[in-house]
Amino acid sequence: MRAIETLRTALAAIIEEEGLAWPSKTVIEPPRDPRHGDLSVNSAMLLAREAKTNPRELAQKFAARLLERCPDVEKAEAAGPGFCNVTFSQAFWRQTVTDIESAGQAYGESREPGRRVLLEYVSANPTGPLHVGHGRGAAVGDSLARLLRKAGHHVHTEYYINDAGRQMRLLGLSVWLRVLELAGRPVEWPEDYYRGDYIIDIAREMLTANPALPDMPAPEGEDLCYEKAMTDILNGIKDDLRDFRVEHLRWFSEKTLVETGAVDAAFAALGKSGYTYEQDNAFWFATEQLGDDKNRVLKKSDGSLTYFASDIAYHHDKFERGYDWLIDVWGADHHGYIPRMRAAITAMGKERDSFDVVLIQLVNLLREGQPVSMSTRAGTFETLADVIKEVGTDAARFMFLSRKSDSPLDFDLELAKQRSLDNPVYYVQYAHARICAVLRRAAERGFVLPEKSDAALLAPLDTAEDMTLLRKAAAFEDMLFAAAQSLGVHHVSHYLTELAGLLHSYYARHQVLLADDAPRTLARLALLRSVGQVVRNGLDVLGVSAPESM
């Protein structure tokens, strides 16, 4: 927010003139009660002992100096035990409109150089279609990539294909047994096979293309079924994600880790750290020394790799490719996996802030108030494709992003389909459409709004509601920064909901097109146009469209 930077710059100069240093624990934020000002700062309380004075007296001195040297400050006063509360002038807040007009689509973006980020998300086993839980992870991961790019980071996105484990062998077996069943052969079903209709569809397609398939030896038949099933399912996943406006820049195969020597390279890196050892013909990683609850096997006595070994190799490979911040989006059921992966990152010699995990909690899908049961293996789940078809990509993404990702989410399908202000995504999109409608009507009535507003055009913006809307629009930059810092995309949806609420309230209280007051009309049109730009920019972070009419 320009207000925070303005206050920080002015106050830092005052503190330096006093022979003091800017306190690292300084907090500049809006006071709880907006009647107490636009911003409150605690510097005086942090510096009082060093300045050998009373915190409140120091706050009073800071307030007086701010009024003297900062023309944008309309009011500054000491409050409480030593806060300094600051109110900016209306002219200062009106400048928000010109800031937004100048930046356009780039409004809210950071100009600071960022980090090289590798963001891995979804990465569902290609054993079946994506379900709504995967959809939430997809929405969070894709929007997080958009958010981090806004914050100045260079973000590469990947989908890790688990194509080398037991689940894939079980997938091939499940399709093979369906092929035999469709051919009238006797079949003994294992307890944990995949039962969905999609398995039957793949088996039927294979049998139609090759009627002699059931006569093949089981190992060869299972391999063919595995290859066909994985290819079909993975293509379906890619199609679903494309429909959901989700793009992964690379699809990384687990199998390639062994083929390219990435596993050996990772083991060598861990060996240099002194945390690996051999015991009982197995290769171990001493994660207990690094905060895990026990040591972990990487290579079993039969020579096969554990899942953990592959994951370590994959993360080591990411660092080797030059990325300095790895972010994984995992299901909440993987929470216990974080300490051992952090141990591996530490053993590689990387800093703690080089690895973060965003957890995705369960989605409780509701239809007519009743929960929809989901089980991938039983084939009784609601797919992401089904949800997109029923409620649309916009509603699905916004709903998935409406709560903190590590909190369970109730997804009400009926609510998501409503074309009313009770529907959260409709509420925000309608704010944008409403602004566009006003601008169209204004043009039809002959009001000509210049591309860039000047101080004279904006001067009629002088009501309390004008200032409230301006302050909220100005807060967009800080909100994006805080959301990126915390990896919390839900902050964006919450902000947009609040901004839309202020816009709807403003529209209800104030007539925008005034036949007898052209100057005020143009000022309000400029205000609404800038708010519309902020709504568009925010919806873009969420991967949600901003319709011009609804």
Swiss-Prot record:
What's any GO biological process attached to this entry? arginyl-tRNA aminoacylation
Gene3D superfamilies listed in its UniProt record: Arginyl tRNA synthetase N-terminal domain (3.30.1360.70), HUPs (3.40.50.620), Isoleucyl-tRNA Synthetase, Domain 1 (1.10.730.10)
Q: Where is this motif: 'HIGH' region?
A: 124-134
- Major localisation: cytoplasm
Q: Which Pfam families does the UniProt entry name for this protein?
A: Arg_tRNA_synt_N (PF03485), DALR_1 (PF05746), tRNA-synt_1d (PF00750)
Q: Which InterPro entries match?
A: aa-tRNA-synth_I_CS (IPR001412), Arg-tRNA-ligase (IPR001278), Arg-tRNA-synth_N (IPR005148), Arg-tRNA-synth_N_sf (IPR036695), ArgRS_core (IPR035684), DALR_anticod-bd (IPR008909), Rossmann-like_a/b/a_fold (IPR014729), tRNAsynth_Ia_anticodon-bd (IPR009080)
Alphabetically sorted, this entry's keywords are: Aminoacyl-tRNA synthetase, ATP-binding, Cytoplasm, Ligase, Nucleotide-binding, Protein biosynthesis
Which EC number(s) does UniProt give?
Answer: 6.1.1.19
**Binding partners and assembly:** Monomer.
Name assigned to this protein = Arginine--tRNA ligase
**Native species of this protein?**
Desulfovibrio desulfuricans (strain ATCC 27774 / DSM 6949 / MB)
Gene name of the encoded protein: argS
